[in-house]
Amino acid sequence: MNKAKIFMNGQSQAVRLPKEFRFSVKEVSVIPLGKGIVLQPLPNSWKDVFQEMAEISSDDIFPEGRKDLPPQKRKYFE
């Protein structure tokens, strides 16, 4: 398991990432997940955003052979 060091940088808390986890961008988004967080790189420009969107295949979003669940029976408000 890889570890990262947490330290204070002025009034902010910072994380020193191991070399293999370095980001190539200047900013990341911080997403809370349970008791932890997920860091994701933010694109540097709109050009990067559109390039990333172009790389997404519809098969990644809607895989072939995906089955929909049957409709659920629900109690209506009375």
UniProtKB/Swiss-Prot annotation:
Keywords: DNA-binding, Toxin-antitoxin system. The keyword DNA-binding applies. Gene3D superfamilies: 2.10.260.10. Transmembrane segments: none annotated. One of its GO terms (molecular function) is DNA binding. It comes from the Bacteria. PROSITE patterns: SPOVT_ABRB. Coiled coil: none annotated. Residues 4-44 form the SpoVT-AbrB domain. Antitoxin component of a type II toxin-antitoxin (TA) system. Upon expression in E.coli or S.cerevisiae neutralizes the effect of cognate toxin VapC2, partially inhibits the RNase activity of VapC2. Belongs to the VapB family. Forms complexes with VapC2; probably VapC2(4):VapB2(2) in the absence of DNA, and VapC2(4):VapB2(4) in the presence of DNA. Crystallizes as heterodimers with stoichiometry VapC2(4):VapB2(4) in the presence of its probable promoter DNA. The heterodimers are in contact via alternative VapC-VapC and VapB-VapB interactions. This subunit contacts DNA. This is Antitoxin VapB2. It comes from Rickettsia felis (strain ATCC VR-1525 / URRWXCal2) (Rickettsia azadi). The gene is vapB2.
